[in-house]
Amino acid sequence: MELGLVGLGKMGGNMRERIRRAGHTVIGYDRNPDVADVHSLEELVGKLKGPRVVWVMVPAGAATQSTIDELAELLSPGDVVVDGGNSRWTDDEKHAVELGLKGIGFVDCGVSGGVWGLENGYALMYGGDAENVAKVQPVFDALKPEGEFGSVHAGKVGAGHFAKMVHNGIEYAMMQAYAEGWELLEKVDSVTDVREVFRSWQEGTVIRSWLLDLAVNALDEDEHLDRLRGFAADSGEGRWTVEAAIDNAVPLPAITASLFARFASRQDDSPQMKMIAALRNQFGGHAVESKK
């Protein structure tokens, strides 16, 4: 089949290559002319035969909204837009309504796989009407990992991005658990080879995982992570997961704590701990440390 792909960055560029390897035609557009196949969205749409499928792989928020707005004016009834970026699931219904007024279908798709997806395939979670999903199915089949699993029609519009959001929340908590275990192992004198302890966990243990494999890779490159600063950004999906939990009265202690740990990583000196130190001094005369 033919596919229009908007956004050819680290993810989009590799996705274009994987889809082409499966025998499909991909016409890609990106603001960077060095990687684009066409010079504009209008040219991209013009090169596709109807019913068209256009996959949007640009940053969430304003960039996605402006791309969908432009496609709404260029596409025809029966065409389908897929949002494969990390959009907030609450935006999906809005996009579906906007496009639906012009007879254009909409599918949201959460994509996981990162820079490894080109060779290993991408895990896909998508939401939308069955009729629209069917038009995109050959692309889903090309992108997914080999085998029975790795993709799912999660439900109606918004379900794909919601599932990906929860996936990322779980990822936050798993990474935090590995990080806490690593720090404790590094702290004690009795454990003399933390890296090899992590490596030993890769086979036969209940905590083996791809994230653990990546942790071992990182320790092979920098055994004590001395070259790194302890600073971790958050993409936004961890926050959205916690907000969704609040909205639905679902307890999420591990994921919430992992998000707050990232906030703490950005502080050179904790204002909260200053207040706690001051209070301990006030009520108990406990010693405080002054700035040097």
What is each residue range found by the language model?
Residues 22, 102, 248:
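Conserved dinucleotide-binding and phosphotransfer motif residues
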Residues 26, 106-107, 252:
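Hydrophobic beta-strand scaffold residues
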Residues 31-94, 100, 118-128:
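Rossmann-like NAD(P)-binding element
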Residues 67-69, 88-188:
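Rossmann-fold dinucleotide-binding core
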Residues 125, 135, 158-286:
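Helical "substrate-binding/catalytic lid" subdomain
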